[in-house]
Structure formats: structure tokens, C-alpha cells
């Protein structure tokens, strides 16, 4: 039945949900990649759709910006609608010199300055990691599509406009591939409620060089990332 944030019924969502931050990107994915897509959520404008990809039922829904927002939606999808796998498909910023604009990054793990997972984990550090099989399937899907995806750590920041520029030096030292705002929270929710999760990002801007994609590009041109996510679902079904 419907929750405070999702006005759908059991069965409206597939067991796998792709989740961009922007609900308009969710609409774009549904209209571009899914067949027979229908809207299953519109509460607070957080659009959700269910359709099929190569005959496989798949859903896509926005999760908003930041760990608090994505935690609400992922928790409700898992506990109230039976979702088993969540794939975040979003954008990230780069700090490493060899990571370039529009590179695809598969988030094997996610560091964070948020305290949300410490609250969940009795004030201890929780290793926020993606599901191994989902990582492997995404890597295999990328190879099959001819996309040279990078695999490694993300950093999920609580602040988009960070006052601590020195932290980027630390991220570079530790080899952080991308800075975003949700992966660590999604991995924590998935672990807490027995689901599986993965984050795939496209580099939308470079923090060092100040190169960036436009808002329109972020909504419509990150197709390699979406194809990797969708094809990885099909590979997972073969296991």
C-alpha cells in the first residue's frame, strides 16, 4: 500500500529500481529506454515509472539530493514494495587528474562525512560497500558495451558547497574516484534492510579543472551509464 512518500501499490514496482537523483532524469530514462512505461509515483514530484527493458520488468524513480532524501525513498521501496536491488545512476565530481569529464565510475565503496551510518551502526564505522555480484555484472556490462568504466571508492558528501577545500587534497591522496551525495547512505539502507545496492556515476564536473557539463547534458547525455545499469540487471538474472 502507499507510504507517506510513494503513492503506489504492491506490485507496481519491479524488484530492481534504477534511481537517479533528478525525477526528470527518471522520466527521461523511462521514456528513452523502457517499453510500456507507466507512472507509478508522483508524490512531491518525485516521479517513478515501471516498464520493461528487453522484456525484463524494471522500475526507475528519482531519489532527490543527499543522504536523508535517498534514505527515505530507498527504505520505503525495500520494506513496503519488495524491492530487492537498487542501482543509483547519477553524477559525480572528480578530483583525480586522470579522471575525465563523462567518465563512468562504478562505486565499489563509499566514504562519507555524514553521520547517518554511524547512527545506524551504534556509533561505529560501517563499511559502506556495493553488492559484489552487482559490481561484477556492471563491470562485465561496461566491457560488453565498450565502455572503459572505472571501479573504486566514491565520497558521499553532506555539503554540496563545501567550505573545506583541503578535503579535496585528502580525497586525491586516497584515490577517491568521484564525489557525490548519496551512495554511502544507499549502501547503508540496503545493508540494514537486507537488499542489494550499487552506484554508477558519470563525471559531470572536475573540481580541479572547473570543467563541467550543462544541466541539460546531465539529464539527457549520460546514456552509457544507463545502458550499463540496465544490461547489468540482465546479467544478474542469468546467475
UniProtKB/Swiss-Prot annotation:
PTM-bearing positions, type N6-acetyllysine: 27
Site feature location: Important for catalytic activity: 218
EC number assigned by the record: 2.4.2.1
Pfam family, one: PNP_UDP_1
Record's function text: Catalyzes the reversible phosphorolytic breakdown of the N-glycosidic bond in the beta-(deoxy)ribonucleoside molecules, with the formation of the corresponding free purine bases and pentose-1-phosphate.
Entry annotated with the keyword Glycosyltransferase: yes
Matches recorded under Gene3D superfamilies: Nucleoside phosphorylase domain
Binding site for phosphate: 21, 25, 44, 88-91
GO biological process: purine nucleoside catabolic process
Binding site for a purine D-ribonucleoside: 5, 180-182, 204-205
Quaternary context: Homohexamer; trimer of homodimers.
GO MF term (any one): purine-nucleoside phosphorylase activity
Name of the protein in question: Purine nucleoside phosphorylase DeoD-type
PANTHER family in the cross-refs: PURINE NUCLEOSIDE PHOSPHORYLASE DEOD-TYPE, URIDINE PHOSPHORYLASE
Residue positions of the active site: 205 (proton donor)
Keywords in alphabetical order: Acetylation, Glycosyltransferase, Transferase
GO terms under cellular component: cytosol
PROSITE patterns for the chain: PNP_UDP_1
Taxonomic lineage: Bacteria, Pseudomonadati, Pseudomonadota, Gammaproteobacteria, Enterobacterales
UniProt family annotation: Belongs to the PNP/UDP phosphorylase family.
Reaction equations catalysed: a purine D-ribonucleoside + phosphate = a purine nucleobase + alpha-D-ribose 1-phosphate; a purine 2'-deoxy-D-ribonucleoside + phosphate = a purine nucleobase + 2-deoxy-alpha-D-ribose 1-phosphate
InterPro entries in UniProt: DeoD-type, Nucleoside_phosphorylase_CS, Nucleoside_phosphorylase_d, Nucleoside_phosphorylase_sf
Amino acid at each position: 500500500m502507499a507510504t507517506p512518500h510513494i503513492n503506489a501499490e504492491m506490485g507496481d514496482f519491479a524488484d530492481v529500481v534504477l534511481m537517479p537523483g533528478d525525477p526528470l532524469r527518471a522520466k527521461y530514462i523511462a521514456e528513452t529506454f523502457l517499453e510500456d512505461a507507466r507512472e507509478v509515483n508522483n508524490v512531491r514530484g518525485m516521479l517513478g515509472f515501471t516498464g520493461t527493458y528487453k522484456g525484463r520488468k524494471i522500475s526507475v524513480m528519482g531519489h532527490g539530493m543527499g543522504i536523508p532524501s535517498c534514505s527515505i525513498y530507498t527504505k520505503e521501496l525495500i520494506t513496503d514494495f519488495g524491492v530487492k536491488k537498487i542501482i543509483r545512476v547519477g553524477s559525480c565530481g572528480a578530483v583525480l587528474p586522470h579522471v575525465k569529464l563523462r567518465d563512468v565510475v562504478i562505486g565499489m565503496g563509499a566514504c562519507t562525512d555524514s553521520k547517518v551510518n554511524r547512527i545506524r551502526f551504534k556509533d561505529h564505522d560501517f563499511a559502506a560497500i556495493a553488492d559484489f555480484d552487482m559490481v561484477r555484472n556492471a563491470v562485465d556490462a561496461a566491457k560488453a558495451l565498450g565502455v572503459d568504466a572505472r571501479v573504486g571508492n566514491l565520497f558521499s558528501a553532506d555539503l554540496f558547497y563545501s567550505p573545506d577545500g583541503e578535503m579535496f587534497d585528502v580525497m586525491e591522496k586516497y584515490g577517491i574516484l568521484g564525489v557525490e551525495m548519496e551512495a554511502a547512505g544507499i549502501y547503508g539502507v540496503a545493508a540494514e534492510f537486507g537488499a542489494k545496492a550499487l552506484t554508477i556515476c558519470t563525471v559531470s564536473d572536475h573540481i580541479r579543472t572547473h570543467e563541467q557539463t550543462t544541466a541539460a547534458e546531465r539529464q539527457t547525455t549520460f546514456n552509457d551509464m544507463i545502458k550499463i545499469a540496465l544490461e547489468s540487471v540482465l546479467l544478474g538474472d542469468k546467475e
